[in-house]
Amino acid sequence: MGPAFNRLWAGSIVSNLADGVLIAAAPLLAITLTDSTVLISIIGAMVMLPWLLFAIPIGALVDRVDRRFILAASNAIRSAVIGIVALGIATGHVTIFWLIASAFVIGICEVANDTTAQSLIPQILDEEHYEKGNSRLQISETVIQGFIGSPLSGFLYALAMWLPFFINSIGYAVAMLLALSIPIQYLQDVRVESSKENKPHFVEDIKFGIKYLYNHKVLRRLVVTTATIGVCYSMGTATMVLFIIKELELAPKYFGVILTIQGLGALLGAIVAPKASKKFGRSIMMTIGITGSSVILLAQGFAPNIYIFVALATLGGFAIAQWNILLMATYQTVIPNELYGRIHGTRRTLVWGMMPIGSVLGGVLAHYSLRLPMYVGGIIASVIAISSIKFFMSIASKTEAAQ
């Protein structure tokens, strides 16, 4: 796949290890700081809110500067913020509001990191390798986060509450160094040399990204549909840690193990996605992924015990991994590389930027019943996905024709 992709992949592996540790430790820390379902859901909302506020300008920035520096800066800031949280825990000064503020900053860095990484794929790989490249990144994310990061987090958390956050901070620092070592020629260098005098203003870049997506009818519908379903997913999962621990009565020390088991489905989905797409067609597998995961979200609300819940979550992970990998390959095929940052930023503003609404709604619904967010989110997502099957089934041919 080449040295550029290998460095990107290595950085992704390290940052995913840090993410896995944080994903398991942060909810456990949160429920020791507050019993409020609304405050806990706000943490998830704060991670997603930057997609609404900053994805478009960050996307434009990604198309204008050396992308290594954006990756490095985002990891450096995450390292510093989580390091401060670890210090706050160790000294007994951390509060739920401190955690909420940190989640917002981490969310901004996630916007920059994700947008930049996705923009690099079509720059460093040939089109026929898009699905393979995305699959490798997804597999490493699933394996490292789910099978190493989460169990490691539980072990570290048992030793000392601050320890997983300290390790998380170190991981992001290493990812920063790896990002700076990626050996590729960047688009900005080409743009400056070829059109230095006519280089568009930053604001014009932002406007162009919005206009491009709006005028592309197929991409526009795909983004709007995905964004709506994303709100439902966010609603259904906002307080899931409380559901698992309080409703299904799982001991907190086993929470990381549950995340690991759930990751099996996502791992299998990531491995199978490129081969299944080649054999059955991208449109068919995308349709199965989005529809199946929506129905499974609803079914999770009816889980009578932790065993049924984990089985459903594992199937859901398989379906979502299929969808994510093939969706990214579709976007990377359709959107011109030199425009990818702007278009990706606009798309993520709608898709991920709307998720905080779902998180807050999920927290409000959970106040009445911890199962209610999954009922409501699952029903709405399933209705939208099923009613869009015809569109999803034709998505590959439509996007190719729309180019």
What is the role of each PLM region?
Residues 1-6, 185-224:
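Juxtamembrane intracellular "pre-TM" segments in multi-pass secondary transporters
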